[in-house]
């Protein structure tokens, strides 16, 4: 960066500081703000807490400042909520008031400034997009129509692992094959198509683009330019890469998937998949073509990878807890005999369901949920919440607080058959809201729960899942991001066939 730009940035910071002090004096409005660490002018708490606002760091701050706290991150107000009662207030009781989504410089690029559903503000556009996406993606009818496909994809995973000679000896990184399964599960619903193998060039191009999109948006690297707009020139290359990637992904979605469905619909006149429903909504003038592409963007980001993370965490915990793995296997043998688990079987397998819930509790894929925002000044727990504050619900801490759970740091599925028997993943208890609650909850829960259950069930039926030779456990170190909680190292797992 040249000296002139640095000089301009420093001058901008000085002017901003003076203006902030003048405005504060002139307005004179005293707000009762939530507690939090004292901040410095302009940067606020940014230099104190840093960029890494992950669920564990925010838990530590909550233990210090309480169930609601305020961080001033440059020009952004960030409110962190860490109690079930306040989570209910944000997600349900004041679901309209706090029902919008925050914007940042990177997500504005990838969502066209909120032309999608997941990251748009609460209002008419969100209601329209939610309605258009619900019927083809998120209903019991969709589950009934697609469950056989999910079961088939899980069967093919088992077959491919069996064929790999390394799987039963040194082990394999099973995530790679499961990633193909997840893409096929969702692309069957979305486009009525699938990829034949992990070597498919189009699959690998799509996967690479989505991985880069995830890296760029999940990184904490760009926070400084979002918190302090005058520093945004330092992000020029970062944002240029985001724009370039967005164009590449949208072109790939359009050329290889959306246009194909248009051609098929013109030839047959039939509606066979979710994209056909969405293109019909475009034909009727309910949405524009950019909205169509942003729906594809949302499914690629919000449905595929998040479910894959949960499956990967579930496998790691089963490997590290062989007695729990055996109980799952014994339950399926008792209930199903030798039959492979199917989606309708899941309700007859309470221990398997408990394993899924315990995975979502301890290893929540979206530990802070998707951030909320209030468009107007609001109130929460008696405190003033300035308009356009970013509201983070630390859902992971709610589900792992030792004041509210028995031995929460243990992977113990039995809790959901004993003291927490009434607790479900759909949010009937605000201590456990892995998919959120209310208007902005994740509608993908209706797909994620059966896919996770089928996949873990089929793997445990078919294999004894073990750590690699010479190891007692697989590494479960976390890799937190802006919105995610992934496993740091994709585990190598020995898959020893049960019938061997």
UniProtKB/Swiss-Prot annotation:
Its EC number is 1.14.14.91. It is an enzyme of class 1 (oxidoreductase). One of its GO terms (cellular component) is membrane. Heme binds at residue 442. Pfam families: p450. It catalyses: (E)-cinnamate + reduced [NADPH--hemoprotein reductase] + O2 = (E)-4-coumarate + oxidized [NADPH--hemoprotein reductase] + H2O + H(+). (E)-cinnamate binds at residues 213-218, 302. Disulfide bonds: none annotated. SUPFAM superfamilies: Cytochrome P450 (SSF48264). Keywords: Heme, Iron, Membrane, Metal-binding, Monooxygenase, Oxidoreductase, Transmembrane, Transmembrane helix. Pathway: Phenylpropanoid metabolism; trans-4-coumarate biosynthesis; trans-4-coumarate from trans-cinnamate: step 1/1. It is found in: Membrane. The chain crosses the membrane at residues 3-23. One of its GO terms (molecular function) is heme binding. Its cofactor is heme. It is a single-pass membrane protein. One of its GO terms (biological process) is lignin metabolic process. Induction: Induced by wounding. Expressed in roots and leaves. Belongs to the cytochrome P450 family. Catalyzes the first oxidative step of the phenylpropanoid pathway in higher plants by transforming trans-cinnamate into p-coumarate. The compounds formed by this pathway are essential components for lignification, pollination, and defense against ultraviolet light, predators and pathogens. This is Trans-cinnamate 4-monooxygenase. It comes from Oryza sativa subsp. japonica. The lineage of its organism: Eukaryota, Viridiplantae, Streptophyta, Embryophyta, Tracheophyta.
């Amino acid at each position: 960066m040249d000296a002139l730009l640095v000089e301009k940035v420093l001058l901008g910071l000085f002017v901003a500081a003076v203006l902030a002090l003048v405005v504060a004096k002139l307005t004179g409005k005293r707000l009762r703000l939530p507690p939090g660490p004292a901040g410095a002018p302009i940067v606020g708490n940014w230099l104190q807490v840093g960029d890494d606002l992950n669920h564990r760091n925010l838990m530590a701050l909550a233990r210090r400042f309480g169930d609601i706290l305020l961080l001033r991150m440059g020009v952004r107000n960030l409110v962190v909520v860490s109690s079930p009662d306040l989570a209910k207030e944000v997600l349900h009781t004041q679901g309209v008031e706090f029902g919008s989504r925050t914007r940042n410089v990177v997500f504005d690029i990838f969502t066209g400034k909120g032309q999608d559903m997941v990251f748009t503000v609460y209002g008419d556009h969100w209601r329209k997009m939610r309605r258009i996406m619900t019927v083809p993606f998120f209903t019991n009818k969709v589950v009934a129509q697609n469950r056989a496909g999910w079961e088939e994809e899980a069967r093919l995973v088992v077959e491919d692992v069996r064929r790999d000679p390394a799987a039963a000896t040194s082990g394999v990184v099973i995530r790679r094959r499961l990633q193909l399964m997840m893409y096929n599960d969702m692309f069957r619903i979305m486009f009525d198509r699938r990829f034949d193998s992990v070597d498919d060039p189009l699959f690998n191009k799509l996967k690479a683009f989505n991985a880069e999109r995830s890296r760029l948006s999940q990184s904490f690297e760009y926070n400084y330019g979002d918190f302090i707009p005058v520093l945004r020139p330092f992000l020029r290359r970062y944002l240029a890469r985001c724009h370039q990637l967005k164009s590449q992904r949208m072109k790939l979605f359009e050329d290889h998937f959306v246009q194909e469905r248009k051609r098929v619909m013109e030839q047959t006149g039939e509606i066979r998949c979710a994209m056909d429903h969405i293109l019909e909504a475009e034909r009727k003038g309910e949405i524009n073509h950019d909205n169509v592409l942003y729906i594809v963007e949302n499914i690629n980001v919000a449905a595929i990878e998040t479910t894959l993370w949960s499956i990967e965490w579930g496998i790691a915990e089963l490997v590290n807890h062989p007695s729990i793995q055996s109980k799952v296997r014994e339950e399926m043998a008792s209930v199903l005999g030798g039959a492979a688990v199917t989606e309708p079987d899941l309700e007859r397998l309470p221990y398997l369901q408990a394993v899924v819930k315990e995975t979502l509790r301890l290893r929540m894929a979206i530990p802070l949920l998707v951030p909320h925002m209030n468009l107007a000044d609001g109130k929460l727990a008696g405190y003033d919440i300035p308009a356009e504050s970013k509201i983070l619900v630390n859902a992971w801490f709610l589900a792992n607080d030792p004041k509210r759970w028995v031995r929460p740091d243990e992977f113990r599925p039995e809790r959901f058959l004993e003291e927490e028997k009434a607790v479900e993943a759909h949010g009937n208890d605000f201590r456990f809201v892995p998919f959120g609650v209310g208007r902005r909850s994740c509608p993908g829960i209706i797909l994620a729960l059966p896919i996770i259950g089928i996949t873990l069930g089929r793997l445990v039926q078919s294999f004894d899942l073990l750590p690699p030779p010479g190891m007692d456990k697989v590494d479960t170190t976390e890799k937190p991001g802006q919105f995610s909680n992934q496993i740091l190292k994709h585990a190598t797992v020995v898959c020893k066939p049960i019938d061997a």
